[in-house]
Amino acid sequence: MAMETKSCQQLHIFFLPFMARGHSIPLTDIAKLFSSHGARCTIVTTPLNAPLFSKATQRGEIELVLIKFPSAEAGLPQDCESADLITTQDMLGKFVKATFLIEPHFEKILDEHRPHCLVADAFFTWATDVAAKFRIPRLYFHGTGFFALCASLSVMMYQPHSNLSSDSESFVIPNLPDEIKMTRSQLPVFPDESEFMKMLKASIEIEERSYGVIVNSFYELEPAYANHYRKVFGRKAWHIGPVSFCNKAIEDKAERGSIKSSTAEKHECLKWLDSKKPRSVVYVSFGSMVRFADSQLLEIATGLEASGQDFIWVVKKEKKEVEEWLPEGFEKRMEGKGLIIRDWAPQVLILEHEAIGAFVTHCGWNSILEAVSAGVPMITWPVFGEQFYNEKLVTEIHRIGVPVGSEKWALSFVDVNAETEGRVRREAIEEAVTRIMVGDEAVETRSRVKELGENARRAVEEGGSSFLDLSALVGELNDLAFGGLVE
């Protein structure tokens, strides 16, 4: 009789994504994956972020609970409910403050719904203690891979950069399976007393107290670092990616991350790609947060034109009558050869198109996984966050991309590389595009990333490494919910 009762019960998981597309998109996919394994999944988000999840809720894959975002109380503009809208360092601090102010409201929602588990973004450091109050496990979601997690932990623990003579002097990151060299200029720089730095420091200690970590990666991509994270750093972790593979239908891929209703047929860029030869087009996109200075955009435009390669370029700029960031006559000369998209683009569908030969990326983890999954080589251009670590995985460990020469971590997401010192020159862009698209090196790089892409697909299939890890986690959470107590 007890077994019958247990089988009738359904595991209910709450998901709390950080309010930024790069965090919300993969956590939505993760909720869909848990749902496909029989769990009831509820995402908690704010009113202005709700449209991001509307398609999944309409299909009945997930449920949605709204929570008020305290923009005004934190000193933010009333409609600022996403980190994608942050334009200054001061706004970043206020946004972090706002994420702490929602804690009591979230606690009330938990009390009302009583889920069996909480999956919360790493930026919500308070979520572990809140989950403990309700005697449910809190799972961490970082939004990056094992390599970056290991590298950042080593840098924070050992401080190998503290006694260098200059920002450009290199150092070896200690206690890693490979010899990885970096410079101080490539590391995150936040004032010690900033809200963001306080949160990062607290996150390490709180992560150790959480039930475990969900990682959007697959074992075959970073086996040494998956083992290192678990055995050397002692973290309990499950690899369940690439989570984007949960979107199997064309419509799901087209709508992923879009607030507007969107279908593949509506995207002219896909029709444009249909007219191109296989592996002939360079796709250029720097994610949802990076806003380059006009001077850097001019270098990109000139470098792309000089390369002679066809391209699709996603630019976060509204069209104006006079655009100083474009070389004179650029769009006229590039007709049929280059396509500029000034809005959201269906990235997964673009990368999966046979015409795409390379991807110029900011090395956000979602973008790297999507490129690997599609078997597309990369030109790496890290900007902030853990992106300089991610670049090392791509260019040195797997050799599935070439660096463009970005050397300086950006403190602000806006007007990136406005100063001459950090700007990537057109010659470097042209050279990187040529390296990744033409010659023997390009062929070898493409072969390596294609093999990884096949491994990625196998990992999420029944019996694959990610499928098995997710199944084991769901089984463990069911046992905790219906057969035991949180350890």
UniProtKB/Swiss-Prot annotation:
Residues where an anthocyanidin binds: H23, G385
Enzyme Commission number(s): 2.4.1.91
Temperature dependence: Optimum temperature is 45 degrees Celsius.
Binding site for UDP-alpha-D-glucose: A345, Q347, H362, W365, N366, S367, E370, E386, Q387
pH dependence: Optimum pH is 6.5.
Annotated catalysed reactions: a flavonol + UDP-alpha-D-glucose = a flavonol 3-O-beta-D-glucoside + UDP + H(+)
UniProt keyword Kinase present: no
Function field: Broad spectrum multifunctional glucosyltransferase. Catalyzes the formation of flavonol 3-O- and 4'-O-glucosides during fruit ripening. Accepted substrates include several flavonoids, hydroxycoumarins and beta-naphthols. Uses UDP-Glc as a sugar donor, but not UDP-Gal or UDP-GlcUA. May also be involved in detoxification of xenobiotics.
Protein family according to the UniProt entry: Belongs to the UDP-glycosyltransferase family.
UniProt name for this protein: UDP-glucose flavonoid 3-O-glucosyltransferase 7
Source organism of the structure: Fragaria ananassa
Lineage: Eukaryota, Viridiplantae, Streptophyta, Embryophyta, Tracheophyta
Chain's gene name: GT7
